[in-house]
Each structure stands twice: as structure tokens, then as C-alpha cells.
Amino acid sequence: MEERNKTLGEFIIENQKAFQYSSGELSRIINSIRLAAKVVNYKVNKAGLVDIIGAAGEQNIQGEDQQKLDVYANEVFIQTLINREIVCGIASEENDDFITVQGSDNCHNNKYVILMDPLDGSSNIDVNVSVGTIFSVFRRITPIGTPVTSEDFLQPGINQVAAGYVIYGTSTMLVYTTGFGVNGFTLNPAIGTFYLSHPNMKFPENGNIYSVNEGNYVHFPQGVKNYIKYCQREEEDRPYTSRYIGSLVADFHRNMIKGGIYIYPTSSKASKGKLRLLYECNPMAFIAEQAGGKATDGFGRIMEIQPTELHQRVPFFCGSKSMVEKAEEFMAAE
């Protein structure tokens, strides 16, 4: 079978066979993400026709106004994972605390926990901008057969066993890694099947796109200001192109394909940064590194940060390796 004609299901089965002692649990998690993503995709594509755009009237733990689609996507992913009894715990941007999944026999025997942002960029849904789902999977630390604890979720990113995102745009794609490269699958809406469309995805070593909210320029650290000036300076290979959508998944996806850097630094308005380490930065960092890119907080590797809280925020510099390293040079000289 031609590589690009493979369905996601076939790809998962083939890769599971490559591991002698694989139990299939991780494969079932990816399959559950696939199923939930199709349900959410259907609702996202109908958002302008039904009463599901706009604010839900409540705030999440971050103090952000929840969108109706945030709430819907959160429920879909959580219920899909719980009903299939394939994880022992779930943490979501939309929930204050993690959820313990007992299983029908109350045995707590599953090996993995999942952390997710069920609908990244949802504040843009009203204006028809691409949104996405981000997920990260860890093997639990506490003994199998016992309820999960915060220790199972507060792991550094280097312990991730899988991570990925779904982008709901002009086409719907699921991109993920299990530590052996990055592959992208595009949904054929006519038959509801994901097909391998982007095998072995790689960040270009360099790029000419920088993605940062320049409206916050006056609030940025001097190192970030200096890097932005560097990107704008007219040289042989510059100025770079500024592209910022405001949806992490969409900005990251474009930069991985075309080459670029995404920056969300600390600022005088957000002293710790805005993006969440566990279910935004860690999974994107894992994907970036598997695709030959780099992800740091401006000074050190994102995936080596030891989390201290579930909704911890960090600054984020992610993209083509040489561009991230150049940004780090400016941060170090600050």
C-alpha cells in the first residue's frame, strides 16, 4: 500500500506491531482522540449555524471566559476517554483539578494519564479562525491499582510517551508523535476517515516567519524586543515576515511546514508568561523536537522543566532550531 493511502487506523496498527511488548493501550488512546476529534470537528464546522459560538457565561480556572465550544469540546474528549476506560486520569485546561478514572470494576488498572487543551484558540471561533486540540500522554508514576495523584500529572515533558494536536481549519488534521517522528493525518469528511497526508514532518532548519503578538511589544523583556528588531532589520536574508494568528495550534502548524518561530514571552502584564506548561507547551515541544525543531523558555529546554502545579504558565519560544537559538542569544544578552 502506498504510504499516503494509509488510514490512521492502519498506521497505528502497523506501528504497534513494531513493538514486541506493546499492550495496545497507547494505540487505543490515539484512536479515542481520533473519534472525539471527528465529533468536535462536526460541531466546529456548524458553529455559525447553531447556537454554540460566543461565551458560555463562566470562567475557567485561569480566569478566562469559557466559550460554548470550549465546554462542548471538553465534555466530548473527557466522556470519550472515560467511556473507553483507557486512561487512569485526565487533566484539562477547563477543569480546576484532574479527574480520576476508576474503570467499571473500580480497579485503577490503566497505565496512562492524559492532559489536554480541548479547544485552543476558541476565542477566535466567532471570526472563523482555525482552532485546535492539544494533548499530552504520560505513563503514570503511582502504582497500578491505586487512584492517580498529582504526582502522575506533574512530570517533566521528557517523560511524555505521546503528544499531538488536531487543527480544525480549511481541512482537519491530526498530527502526533510517540517519540519516533511526527506524522500528520488529514480527515476525508466524505467518509470520516483520517489519511496519512504528511509523513515524517520536519521543521526547516531555518525560516523567515516570526510569530509574536507585537501589540504587547512595550510590555516585553528587552531581549525579546531586540530579537524582534533583528527580525525586522533589512539584511541579506531579512526582514522576516510577521505572521500571528493568535491560535497556538495554527501558528505552530504553519511554522512547522514553512519554517519559523513562535514566541509568547513573559511581559509586564504576564510575569510568568501566558501559555500552560503541561498541556500546551510540553506537547508542542515534544512534537517540535521530534520534527527537528527546538522549544525553550528563552533560556532552557521546555521539556526539562519540573512542573509544580497543574495549570503552571511558562514563556515559550518554539520553532525552527536556528531561529530559536538566535532568540536565546538575545535573551542571554538582555
UniProtKB/Swiss-Prot annotation:
GO molecular function terms listed in the Swiss-Prot or TrEMBL record: fructose 1,6-bisphosphate 1-phosphatase activity; magnesium ion binding
Pfam families linked: FBPase, FBPase_C
UniProt key word Cytoplasm: yes
Enzyme class: hydrolase
GO-annotated biological processes: fructose 1,6-bisphosphate metabolic process; fructose 6-phosphate metabolic process; fructose metabolic process; gluconeogenesis; sucrose biosynthetic process
The entry's keywords: Carbohydrate metabolism, Cytoplasm, Hydrolase, Magnesium, Metal-binding
Pathway, per record: Carbohydrate biosynthesis; gluconeogenesis
Cellular component GO terms, alphabetical: cytosol
EC identifiers of the protein: 3.1.3.11
Keyword Lyase in annotation: no
InterPro entries tied to this protein: FBPase_C_dom, FBPase_class-1, FBPase_N, FBPtase, Fructose_bisphosphatase_AS
Binding site residues for substrate: 120-123, 213, 244, 274
Entry-linked NCBIfam families: PRK09293.1-1, PRK09293.1-3
Family of this protein: Belongs to the FBPase class 1 family.
Database matches in PANTHER family: FRUCTOSE-1,6-BISPHOSPHATASE-RELATED (PTHR11556), SEDOHEPTULOSE-1,7-BISPHOSPHATASE, CHLOROPLASTIC (PTHR11556:SF35)
Protein name per UniProt: Fructose-1,6-bisphosphatase class 1
Gene designation: fbp
